[in-house]
């Protein structure tokens, strides 16, 4: 089949009247734990030193204007979305840093991983999603994250150095019609809704009727991610593309190994602290 016919099929998807959020929600059959009709909670912060306090004020950025940092809850209680009011990666772009060892290409990600309790960092078009370690308190993490984001955007440094945002849904010359339609549907109907929840879905491949996807950001460890993937994404893909038989979640084994090593290190550190004598003087 010619590329022109494939493009016609893609245009049909683009012209579908039902919006992306309605489609994903209706196919999933579940409501998000966050009320999307409510505006983001606005956290206005101001600081001068590293030990800054959280106040209801404006923060001058680069001597030009004030920065308002907003936060939005996500379906994952261990992930929080921060909106600095400026572009982070630009429209449609995302980048995932599941752990500190992957942050070498981003000065901002490196700084955020230095905040105690931060487990993962995810960049979107105009937001930063922070995932915290289990047991860590947002009340302690949020002020530090606010400070890092403000200081960084005041510095004028690039968010990313050499790495490029995800291009997994870019149409390639050797893509067949089914793959092209999967990519188009993911890019125009599914990913925008997932990104609103502070995460992303990355296309990893298609073979023998199985679409392989990787969850990122707040979606990677969200309790409802499997339900969303199967009941929402899979049903939508099957509705438009009969060739799709199922959807599978793909995990990065390297990321799993790093997370496992980090958790073991954390446990050893806690054990050592518990073994330290609590008395003030020599026994």
UniProtKB/Swiss-Prot annotation:
Write down the superkingdom of origin.
Answer: Eukaryota
Give UniProt keywords alphabetically: Iron, Iron-sulfur, Metal-binding, Mitochondrion, Transit peptide
Residues that span the membrane, as ranges:
none
Q: Which organism is it from?
A: Drosophila yakuba (Fruit fly)
Family membership noted in the UniProt record: Belongs to the NifU family.
Q: Where in the cell is it found?
A: Mitochondrion
Q: Write out the residues that bind [4Fe-4S] cluster.
A: 219, 222
- State the function annotated in the UniProt record: Molecular scaffold for [Fe-S] cluster assembly of mitochondrial iron-sulfur proteins.
A GO cellular component annotated for this chain's UniProt record is:
mitochondrion
Protein name as it appears in the record: NFU1 iron-sulfur cluster scaffold homolog, mitochondrial
Record-linked InterPro entries: FSCA_dom_sf, Nfu/NifU_N, Nfu/NifU_N_sf, NIF_FeS_clus_asmbl_NifU_C, RNA-helicase_DEAD-box_CS
One of the protein's GO biological processes: iron-sulfur cluster assembly
Q: Which GO terms describe its molecular function?
A: iron ion binding; iron-sulfur cluster binding
Instruction: Write out the coiled-coil annotation as residue ranges.
Output: none
Ranges where the record places region NifU:
182-250
Cite the residue span of the transit peptide: 1-30
């Amino acid at each position: 089949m010619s590329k022109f016919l494939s493009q016609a099929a893609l245009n049909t998807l683009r012209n579908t009247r039902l919006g992306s959020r309605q489609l994903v929600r209706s196919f999933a059959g579940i409501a998000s734990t966050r009320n999307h009709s409510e505006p983001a909670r606005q956290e206005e912060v101001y600081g001068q030193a590293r030990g800054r306090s959280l106040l209801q004020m404006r923060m001058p950025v680069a001597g030009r204007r004030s920065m308002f940092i907003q936060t939005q809850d996500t379906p994952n209680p261990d992930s929080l979305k921060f909106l600095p009011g400026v572009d982070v990666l630009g429209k449609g772009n995302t980048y995932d840093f599941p752990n500190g060892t992957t942050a070498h290409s981003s000065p901002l990600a490196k700084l955020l991983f230095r905040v105690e309790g931060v487990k993962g960092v995810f960049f979107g078009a105009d937001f930063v999603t922070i995932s915290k370690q289990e047991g860590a308190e947002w009340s302690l993490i949020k002020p530090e994250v606010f400070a890092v984001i403000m200081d960084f955007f005041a510095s004028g440094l690039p968010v990313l150095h050499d790495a490029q945002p995800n291009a997994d849904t870019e149409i390639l010359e050797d893509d067949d019609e089914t793959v092209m339609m999967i990519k188009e549907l993911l890019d125009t109907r599914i990913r925008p809704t997932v990104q609103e929840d502070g995460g992303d879905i990355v296309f990893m491949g298609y073979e023998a009727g199985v679409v392989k996807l990787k969850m990122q950001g707040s979606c990677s460890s969200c309790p409802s991610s499997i339900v969303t993937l199967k009941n929402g994404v899979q049903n939508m893909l099957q509705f438009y593309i009969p060739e799709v038989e199922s959807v599978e979640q793909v995990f990065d084994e390297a990321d799993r190994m790093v997370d496992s090593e980090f958790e073991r290190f954390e446990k050893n550190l806690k054990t050592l602290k518990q073994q330290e004598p609590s008395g003030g003087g020599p026994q």
